[in-house]
Amino acid sequence: MEEISWDDFTRVELRVGRVIGAEPFPEARKPAYVLRVDFGPELGVRKSSAQITDRYRPEDLVGRLVVAVVNFPRKQIGPLMSECLVTGFADAEGRIALCVPDADVPLGARLV
């Protein structure tokens, strides 16, 4: 494992957002959803593609808090311009479990 400096870590903006929309993304190469995530007044709403269809249904995602990287460059994924990277962990079968705060925190709160 490569070590990084504290300065490297602090450059990554991991923020809390609330999923306000989730819909299938049929144009994606692998099964995915298009998520709309609200990061509060400072950052607003951003879109992301998330390969989480094995574990979550769209209706179960709306209203959930998630942790996302918000300072990566935007990335074109098929017809979608992804504006953040929603984070998660893969289980033994490769299914993604979302990284979520275990308490209610303000939208846009930064991981410290």
Predicted feature locations:
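Phosphate-backbone binding interfaces of nucleic-acid-interacting proteins
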Residues: 1-112
